[in-house]
């Protein structure tokens, strides 16, 4: 990797970079694009993005390396809510000549990419066990996009990544192929802004940020993004757009960490942290409410700040605030287990052999996603402590923890529990049965009406 995780002066870095040795024929556009756009990666971001673009009337090619994933999408087995499954079914039956829009084609054949006028790269960018970026999928996707790039195309990276990545994985390799970016081909970075399960802020209404290598790159990328965003906000460079995404999710991680700390302090003082935060939120300026919880999950908040920290370490720059916040956030599941032991002890019940149910294992309400969910670590730690653990989640049928597959309890209210951990409450969830449970550990801080309720 040219930057080796370092923050560099991107202007000097790229001004001295040699152009490719194989010139390509100048072309303003490809005359026979069969698709308006191709979306590379059909996961939690790529598939909704492809659907939004198709819904706007564009001809969309959806590309994923996994034939199994494509088969699941076609069969309606994909990790989508019911409404989105219906959108997929409708899109797949739309004929290219239909007046409602264009084609919606799913494939694992990357050789079709030259038929798309724009290519959106929407693949996961997780972290590894050392908290360093795992760029395996991103490198592969960008390499595929570059290998199949043709004059007149616009390539847009949307995956969260380090500052300088767009130039490293797209701009440089394209130049090595002989393209002149901004003339033959166009490159931009537009970080995804999708919040699964959020019906209030849907993708088509949320503004998008875009930074391009040249003004023409921005113009072309924005023309596409306007089809699936509320508006488009242009910044001066791809690096500014990359840093924007890191700032957004680091902001959330730091504030969640502070909310957790205030929750612990408030419990010690006998105060209700939810009441405190709600009261503070009446201030119309200088405040934004963040609520405490059992930890953070998904592939955004637990991961994205580590892309920045990794890059800073490469430049021998420290960020103690962010580092401390991420350490505290990561330690939250351990705190949950400690509180379980304490609450059970208050009832003279030993953790060993205790019957514990986790209510909700998805990382957030309204989704079936368990990636990086704190619930998984909580389950594993409870088992190590000797507890017998079950879970109940109306959106998640099974989870695998420590090599053991668990199945959701269908009727949790009909069984006897020593303690129930309320981890995730999906919209419309029935919690009336919790009033009959002897001990409830409410990690959502939202069930103040329960008699036998404890908080973290």
Regions found by a protein language model. Give the residues of each.
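Structural/interface elements that position substrates and couple domains in central-metabolism enzymes
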Residues: 2-456
């Amino acid at each position: 990797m040219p930057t080796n995780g370092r923050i560099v002066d991107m202007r000097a870095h790229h001004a001295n970079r040699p152009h490719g040795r194989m010139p390509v024929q100048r072309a303003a556009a490809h005359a026979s694009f069969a698709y308006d756009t191709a979306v590379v990666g059909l996961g939690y971001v790529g598939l909704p993005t492809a659907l939004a673009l198709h819904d706007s009337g564009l001809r969309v090619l959806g590309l994923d390396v996994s034939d199994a994933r494509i088969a699941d999408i076609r069969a309606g087995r994909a990790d989508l809510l019911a409404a989105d499954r219906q959108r997929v079914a409708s899109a797949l039956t739309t004929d290219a000549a239909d007046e409602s829009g264009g084609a919606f084609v799913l494939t694992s054949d990357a050789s079709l990419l030259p038929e798309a006028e724009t290519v959106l790269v929407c693949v996961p960018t997780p972290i590894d066990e050392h908290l360093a970026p795992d760029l395996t999928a991103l490198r592969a996707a960008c390499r595929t996009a570059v290998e199949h790039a043709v004059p007149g195309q616009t390539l847009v990276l949307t995956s969260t990544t380090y500052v300088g990545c767009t130039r490293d994985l797209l701009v440089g390799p394209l130049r090595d192929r002989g393209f002149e970016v901004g003339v033959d081909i166009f490159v931009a970075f537009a970080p995804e802004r999708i919040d699964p399960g959020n019906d209030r802020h849907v993708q088509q209404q949320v503004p998008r940020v875009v930074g391009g290598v040249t003004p023409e790159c921005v113009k072309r990328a924005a023309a596409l993004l306007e089809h699936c965003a509320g508006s488009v906000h242009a910044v001066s460079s791809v690096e500014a757009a990359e840093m924007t995404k890191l700032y957004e999710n680091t902001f959330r991680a730091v504030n969640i960490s502070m909310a957790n700390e205030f929750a612990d302090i408030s419990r010690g003082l006998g105060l209700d942290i939810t009441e405190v935060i709600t009261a503070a939120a009446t201030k119309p300026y200088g405040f934004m409410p963040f609520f405490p919880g059992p930890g953070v999950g998904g592939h955004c908040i637990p991961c994205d700040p580590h892309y920045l920290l990794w890059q800073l370490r490469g430049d021998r720059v420290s960020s103690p605030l962010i580092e401390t916040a991420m350490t505290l956030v990561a330690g939250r599941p351990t705190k949950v287990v400690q509180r379980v032991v304490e609450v059970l002890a208050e009832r003279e019940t030993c953790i060993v052999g205790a019957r514990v149910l986790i209510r909700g294992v998805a990382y957030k309400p309204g989704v079936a996603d368990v990636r990086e969910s704190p619930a998984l670590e909580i389950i594993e730690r409870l088992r190590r402590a000797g507890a017998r653990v079950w879970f109940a989640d109306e959106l998640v049928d099974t989870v695998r923890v420590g090599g053991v597959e668990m199945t959701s309890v269908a009727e949790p209210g009909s069984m006897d529990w020593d303690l129930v951990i309320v981890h995730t409450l999906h919209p419309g969830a029935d919690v009336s049965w919790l009033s009959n449970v002897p001990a409830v550990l409410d990690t959502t801080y939202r069930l103040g009406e329960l008699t036998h309720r404890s908080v973290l």
